[in-house]
């Protein structure tokens, strides 16, 4: 490449950043602006041949849908990075139900207002010197949840929906209290880790007088920029395609799966139209998993490792045929395969929408790798979603249990956003 060409490309990039920054401030037309000006920078610059490339660019350049129901961060394309933070009311605030209620209202009001600003602006527009300065919106999204323990603190147990009952103990649990529970939950996602970090810092600081962090975990998945097909189901750290069985977001089953039904009890109506999030910290025993050959791994899961297809099938999205047998009459999908025991057919139709991430904390002091799955499952009621599926996996001998450890667990109610009201206001002030 000649020197004049290099200069022109550098100039073009600077011009693009300036122009796209202006488009980001206006909000409108950002997707078009990103696609048009970034095409010359792509390895394959033929726009007709690379619609996937344009989609990659949009994830970095666009803003999240602030009107997504019940809150942003549940539907739509999943960003590459997420930070889940569980918080408790400060000790001083828990002295009595009145102070707890006032502090909860202050925290939820602050997060609602700040989340709205973050969806419209950027962290560096809100706080001078933020780490995200100079970066695009990166699909930043914020979700706010409420734990059952908060209702106890504000003396509102009578307003606790059955769906927010404590999760039962499962026979395979190896839970650590420091990674469980929480009065509140913040899920913050973005396509760029610096944008994510800057937003998390502002959100935690906004309620620092009323709350304290209980636990947090950062997760990641493949970026849109690196994906050959941004719509493809991502893989986890075990190399599995993970999330194939999710209901399609454009299918009526999706809303039926994630949305809380209208309550029979008016005291529980604050969660009408909301959703329930189960979070599990699942450490993978990757050293043991690596000892298995590909065929053994596929028998554990019940799917092909390369394509994600159910054993005996050809395509990832082919239905799981539990009755299929080989020439010798043996089940093509083993009786203890993960996909068999987790299937709706094996669990009275139980379904959830999984939107999980990988996590990697490096190596512990004892030399053990601390990496695995930040499991997140959305449903209208855990009793017809996560609970029966997890009970089946735990009690019926899921072959995957040998290679994973459930070390953290929490359940949060995620109320629907309502015009002119802060998140959870119907609970706190209702």
From Swiss-Prot:
Molecular function per GO: heme binding; metal ion binding; peroxidase activity
Cofactor(s) the protein needs: heme b
Positions of heme binding: 338
PROSITE patterns given in the database record: DYP_PEROXIDASE, TAT
Record's catalysed reaction(s): Reactive Blue 5 + 2 H2O2 = 2,2'-disulfonyl azobenzene + 3-[(4-amino-6-chloro-1,3,5-triazin-2-yl)amino]benzenesulfonate + phthalate + 2 H2O + 2 H(+)
Temperature dependence: Optimum temperature is about 25 degrees Celsius. Thermostable. Retains 50% of its activity after heating 2 hours at 60 degrees Celsius, while no decrease in activity is observed within the same time at 30 or 40 degrees Celsius.
Activity across pH: Optimum pH is 3.5 with Reactive Blue 19 as substrate.
Result after altering residue 338 to A: Lacks the heme cofactor. 3% of wild-type catalytic activity
Database matches in Pfam families: Dyp_perox_C (PF20628), Dyp_perox_N (PF04261)
EC class of the enzyme, as a word: oxidoreductase
Signal peptide boundaries: 1-39
Protein's UniProt keywords contain Metal-binding: yes
Function: Peroxidase that is able to convert a large number of compounds, but its physiological substrate is not known. Shows high reactivity towards anthraquinone dyes (e.g. Reactive Blue 19) and a modest activity towards standard peroxidase substrates (such as guaiacol and 2,6-dimethoxyphenol) and azo dyes (e.g. Reactive Blue 5). Is also able to oxidize aromatic sulfides enantioselectively, resulting in the corresponding (R)-sulfoxides, but with a poor efficiency. Does not display catalase activity.
NCBIfam families in the record: Dyp_perox_fam
Subunit annotation: Monomer.
Protein name: Dye-decolorizing peroxidase Tfu_3078
């Amino acid at each position: 490449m000649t020197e004049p060409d290099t200069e022109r490309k550098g100039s073009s990039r600077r011009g693009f950043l300036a122009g796209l920054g202006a488009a980001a401030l206006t909000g409108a037309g950002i997707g078009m602006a990103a696609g048009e000006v970034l095409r010359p920078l792509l390895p394959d610059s033929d726009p007709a041949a690379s619609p996937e490339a344009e989609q990659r660019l949009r994830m970095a350049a666009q803003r999240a849908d602030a009107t997504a129901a019940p809150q942003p961060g549940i539907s739509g394309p999943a960003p590459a990075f997420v930070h889940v933070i569980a918080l408790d009311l400060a000790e001083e605030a828990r002295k009595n139900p009145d102070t707890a209620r006032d502090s909860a209202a202050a925290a939820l009001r602050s997060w609602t207002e700040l989340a709205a600003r973050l969806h419209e602006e950027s962290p560096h527009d809100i706080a001078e010197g933020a780490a995200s300065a100079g970066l695009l919106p990166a699909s930043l999204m914020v979700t706010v949840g409420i734990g059952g323990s908060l209702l106890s603190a504000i003396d509102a147990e009578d307003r606790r929906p059955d769906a927010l009952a404590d999760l039962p103990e499962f026979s395979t649990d190896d839970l650590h209290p420091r990674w469980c529970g929480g009065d509140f939950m913040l899920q913050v996602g973005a396509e760029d880790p610096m944008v994510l970090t800057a937003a998390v810092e502002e959100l935690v600081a906004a309620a620092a007088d009323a709350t304290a962090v209980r636990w947090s975990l950062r997760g990641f998945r493949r970026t849109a920029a690196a994906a050959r097909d941004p719509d493809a189901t991502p893989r986890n750290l075990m190399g599995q395609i993970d999330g194939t069985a999710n209901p399609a977001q454009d299918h009526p089953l999706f809303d039926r799966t994630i949305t809380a039904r209208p309550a029979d009890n008016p005291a529980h109506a604050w969660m009408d139209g909301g959703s329930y999030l189960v979070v599990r910290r699942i450490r993978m025993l990757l050293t043991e998993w690596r000892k298995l050959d590909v065929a053994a791994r596929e028998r554990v899961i019940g799917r092909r490792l390369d394509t994600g297809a159910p054993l005996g099938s050809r395509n990832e999205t082919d239905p799981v045929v539990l009755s299929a047998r080989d020439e010798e009459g043996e089940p093509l999908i083993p009786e203890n395969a993960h996909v068999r025991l987790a299937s709706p057919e094996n669990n009275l139709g139980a379904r959830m929408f999984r939107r999980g991430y990988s996590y990697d904390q490096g190596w512990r002091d004892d030399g053990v790798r601390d990496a695995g799955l930040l499991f997140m499952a959305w449903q209208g009621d855990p009793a017809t979603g996560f609970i029966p599926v997890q009970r089946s996996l735990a009690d019926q001998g899921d072959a995957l249990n040998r290679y994973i450890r459930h070390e953290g667990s929490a359940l949060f109610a995620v109320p629907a956003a309502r015009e002119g009201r802060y998140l959870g206001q119907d609970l706190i002030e209702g």
